[in-house]
């Protein structure tokens, strides 16, 4: 069965003024859609068509070598963006077990946000910043391009796209401003759900 572009759980303008409508329309309808189209082309006629995107990306080493790069880039792009849309909400509220765990590990939510922001800003070129569960503990990691932490056995529960296509229309070269705005639209309820499933 072909992979499909998921619908957004909110309107394209729902995250204004933090993430603008035009960026959301292009990011979802063009960028993410292209990953889905290219992923489907890469896996057509292989047994990967019957697997979940999580299973494929977690086991990239088992993907045939001739399509491995295409699947890594486009499968990762599809998985990362599908999760990213769910991690955003116009009704952000900082609460849940995961917020308590963050405070326990970092001392405060602000200290966590600062480290996350620093690592996201320092990610050279295109990539992602993540909060992951690794052996029961929380870790902040970054990945290049469309790589996902599940390839390394870590479970992502919060992710931020720091490719320029995610912010350039509104923030231009000011990635730190985009990262700062991100905290206003984090879906902590979803982060908490993922944390409780992974711990």
UniProtKB/Swiss-Prot annotation:
Endpoints of the signal sequence: none
Which EC class is the enzyme in?
A: oxidoreductase
Q: Name one GO molecular function term.
A: superoxide dismutase activity
**Keyword Glycoprotein in record:** no
Q: What Gene Ontology cellular-component terms does the record carry?
A: cytoplasm
Give the note. Answer: The levels of SOD activity and sodA expression were growth-phase dependent, occurring most during stationary phase. Expression is not affected by manganese. Is not essential for aerobic growth in complex medium.
Cross-referenced Gene3D superfamilies: Fe,Mn superoxide dismutase (SOD) domain, Iron/manganese superoxide dismutase, C-terminal domain
Q: Which InterPro entries did the record assign?
A: Mn/Fe_SOD, Mn/Fe_SOD_BS, Mn/Fe_SOD_C, Mn/Fe_SOD_N, Mn/Fe_SOD_N_sf, SOD_C_sf
Family named by the database record:
Belongs to the iron/manganese superoxide dismutase family.
Q: What is this protein called?
A: Superoxide dismutase [Mn/Fe]
The UniProt subunit note reads as follows: Homodimer.
Q: Keywords, A to Z?
A: Iron, Manganese, Metal-binding, Oxidoreductase, Stress response
Q: Write out the function statement from the record.
A: Destroys superoxide anion radicals which are normally produced within the cells and which are toxic to biological systems. Catalyzes the dismutation of superoxide anion radicals into O2 and H2O2 by successive reduction and oxidation of the transition metal ion at the active site. Also contributes to the inhibition of lipid oxidation. Manganese-preferring enzyme, less active with iron than with manganese.
Q: What is its EC number?
A: 1.15.1.1
Write down the chemical reaction(s) this protein catalyses. Answer: 2 superoxide + 2 H(+) = H2O2 + O2
Q: What induces it?
A: Transcription increases slightly by internally generated superoxide stress.
List the gene name.
sodA
């Amino acid at each position: 069965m072909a992979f499909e572009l998921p619908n957004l759980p909110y309107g394209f303008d729902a995250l204004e003024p933090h993430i603008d409508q035009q960026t959301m329309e292009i990011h979802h309808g063009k960028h993410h859609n292209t990953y889905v189209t290219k992923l489907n082309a890469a896996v057509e006629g292989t047994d990967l068509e019957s697997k979940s995107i999580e299973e494929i990306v977690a086991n990239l080493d088992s993907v045939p070598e001739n399509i491995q790069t295409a699947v890594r880039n486009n499968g990762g792009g599809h998985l990362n963006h599908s999760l990213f849309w769910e991690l955003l909400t116009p009704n952000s509220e900082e609460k849940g077990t995961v917020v308590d765990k963050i405070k326990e590990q970092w001392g405060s939510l602000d200290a966590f946000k600062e480290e996350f922001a620093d690592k996201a800003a320092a990610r050279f070129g295109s990539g992602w910043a993540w909060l992951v569960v690794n052996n029961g503990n929380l870790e902040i990691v970054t990945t290049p391009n469309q790589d996902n932490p599940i390839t390394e056995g870590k479970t992502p529960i919060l992710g931020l796209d720091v490719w320029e296509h995610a912010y350039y229309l509104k923030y231009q070269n000011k990635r730190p401003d985009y990262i700062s705005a991100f905290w206003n639209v984090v879906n902590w309820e979803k982060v908490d759900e993922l944390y409780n499933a992974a711990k």
